[in-house]
């Protein structure tokens, strides 16, 4: 990166170099098997959660893989790819003065192209500080053979 001094003695970045990349942010992920969490339980922190770092340029499938890596793939009983993750964002709406939940999509771990796996996080409207609620279900279509 070429840094040149200007007359004000503050460094200027050269226009020929692009930025290194977007900044990651911490995402609080609240999870439960088979059912959705209640919105108020998420804001009261009574539900188990994990923390993952994410980027706005990542897809829902990539977020699902990060979540599965911490929750599912470390346990011998749940170490298979036949899982579907229903992802929604939880945020506090200051105009309505209450928490709001909005579905982002469903991700299948065995195929990133199914459902909304290719959707970018920045296209979903998620912002820093929003919480993620994940419902983890076995993919019944793939398990029945």
UniProtKB/Swiss-Prot annotation:
Highest taxon in the source lineage: Eukaryota
Major place of residence: cytoplasm
Protein name: Uncharacterized protein C126.13c
Transmembrane segments: none
GO cellular component terms given for this protein: ASAP complex; cytosol; nucleus
Organism, as annotated: Schizosaccharomyces pombe (strain 972 / ATCC 24843)
Localisation per UniProt entry: Cytoplasm; Nucleus
Family, similarity comment: Belongs to the SAP18 family.
Gene Ontology biological-process annotations: mRNA cis splicing, via spliceosome
InterPro entries in the cross-refs: SAP18 (IPR010516), SAP18_sf (IPR042534)
Keyword terms, alphabetized: Cytoplasm, Nucleus
